[in-house]
UniProtKB/Swiss-Prot annotation:
It comes from Nocardia farcinica (strain IFM 10152). PANTHER family: GLUTAMATE-1-SEMIALDEHYDE 2,1-AMINOMUTASE, GLUTAMATE-1-SEMIALDEHYDE 2,1-AMINOMUTASE 1, CHLOROPLASTIC-RELATED. GO terms for cellular component: cytoplasm. This is Glutamate-1-semialdehyde 2,1-aminomutase. Signal peptide: none annotated. Its cofactor is pyridoxal 5'-phosphate.
Amino acid sequence: MSASPRATHASAAASARLFDRAAQVIPGGVNSPVRAFRSVGGTPRFIASADGYTLTDADGNEYVDLVCSWGPMILGHAHPAVVDAVRRAATGGLSFGAPTEAEVELAEHIVARVAPVDRVRLVNSGTEATMSAVRLARGFTGRTKIIKFAGCYHGHVDALLADAGSGVATLGLPTSPGVTGAQAADTIVLPYNDLDAVAAAFEANPGEIACVITEAAAGNMGAVAPLPGFNAGLRELTENHGALLIMDEVMTGFRVSRSGWYGREGVAGDLYTFGKVMSGGLPAAAFGGRAEVMNQLAPLGPVYQAGTLSGNPVAVAAGLATLRAADDAVYAALDRNAERLGGLLTEALTAAGVEHQVQFAGNMVSVFFSDRPVTDYATAKASQTWRFPAFFHALLDGGVYAPPSAFEAWFVSAALDEDAFARIAAALPAAARAAAAATPEGSRA
C-alpha cells in the first residue's frame, strides 16, 4: 500500500526544466494537449513513478491520483498481478504480427462481460476503435451520415471532432483545422440528452443516417449521465430508421461495472468501442458488436481494417490481468470511493459558499461551478469554469492530482484508502475557498 503522500510541493523546478526541454522537440511539450495545463496555467507535472494511489513527480512531490491515467487504472498503479503479467509476456517476445492465444482469451473476456457483443476486433487506441466502428456502420448500412452529440469525445477522428469534448473542449476549439468540409458535412451534431433533436434529424435525413454514436455515459464534458430513457430512446430511434447505435464505452467500459455502462442500464448497442481499462493502461483498445455486423470486416467481408501492432501480446497481457483482478470487490470499492469523494467535495464547496454541482456518471465524478445540474455541453460551458484553475492548483499544492481541466471527469481507483481520503479531505477546504475567491479576471486560464 502506498505511503501517505507528503505535502511538500514547494518546487516544480525539475518539471519546469523538463517542460522547457520537451517544448524543443514535442509540439507544446506534451503528447496530448490537456496535459499541458493550458486551461489551468502553471507547470505541468512530469511524473517519475506511480504506485497504488500515489503519483511521484520529477521533483519528488507525491500526489493522491484522481486522474488514474484518464481512467484505466482501476486497480491503482503498478498492481502486482498486472506488472507480473506484463513482465512474463515481455520475456516471451514483444510483438509477433501473428495471432496469439492471449488475444483470443481477451476477446472471450469482453464477449462474456458485455452480452450484446458477439465478436471483437482488437486495435491500438480508442480513436482507432471509434474510427473503425463508424466505417463499419457505414459499410454495413450503405449510408454515409452519422449523428454525434456536442461535448462527446470519440477520439481525434476527423468526422467526430466537431463540437467534441475532452481536450477540444478544454482548449475551446469548435473543431480542428485539417478536417475537410466534406467530412464535416456528413456529421450531424446534436445536443446531448435531447431525443427530440435526434428524431428530427432522422426525419430530415431519411435513409441517409448510418449510425448514432454516443458516449454510453458522457465523461468528456465532465461526468454527465444520460437522462432516464435517453439511451433507450436512441435504441428505439435507430431501430425504427435502420441505423446502427454505437455505444462508445472507451471510458465507461469495465470501469463503471464489470460490464460497463451496459451492466448498469441494460440498453444494447449494435456496436461498442472499448479502451482504457481493457488494456490495463497499455496502448490497446477494441470494437465489437453483433456478429452479422462484425462479420462484414475483412477478411470475412468487404470493410477493411488492419493494424501491425493490434493484439500486441504485452498490452493484451496487461488487459487480461486487469480484467481477471477486477472482481465484485473491486467494483464495490470503486463505487464506494466515488461516493466518498463526492461527499467530501460537496462538504468543502458548500462550506465555502460557492455554487457547485457534484455529478456522477457511475463512479466517474465531476465538479461544475454552476447553480444548476449539467445535462449537456451547453450547460457545461455555461458553468463558471474560471473558478476551476484556482481550485485545481490549491488541490495540487495540497498533494491531490485532479484533472487539469474543468471538462474532464475525475477517476477513483480501488487502491484509495484511509490515508488517501485523509489527504483529500485536508486539501479540499483551501481549494474550495480558492474557488470561491476566484474572479474571471484573476483566472489562470
